[in-house]
Amino acid sequence: PPAIASRLGLAPGVRLLHLVCLHLADGRPALIEDRWLNPAVLPQKPDFHRQSANEWLLAHVPYTTGDIGFSAANATAEEARLLEVPQGAALFVLDRTTWEGDRPVTCVRLAHTPGYRMQTLI
C-alpha cells in the first residue's frame, strides 16, 4: 500500500512481505502484529512457522536505527474479533519502523489489548 511504502521511504508498487499475527499470553489474545517487511534486505526467505518475525529479524537482519510511536486507538471490528474485546475498545498501539543503514527493514503496528502497560528505564 502507498502509505506503507511512504513510511519505508520506498516507491509505490515495490513488493513487500506482509504478515499479520495474533500473539497470545496465557492462552488469551494479547496483541495483533501487523508487519511489513522489505524483502530486498532479507538474507534468506524467513520461516515464521518456527520463530516470530521479531526473533527472526533480530537473528538475521541487524538494524542500525528506528523510530517508535505510541498511541491509543479504538479497536476496529476485526481487531475486536481477534482480541476478543468490544468494538471501539481502547487499544495501546506501538508503531515502529527500523532501518539497516539507509535501507528500510520493517514497519510494524502492534495493537495491544485494553489494560496493557509498557514500562521502560531511562
Write out the residue ranges for each language-model feature.
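C-terminal all-alpha effector/ligand-binding and dimerization domain
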Residues: 1-122
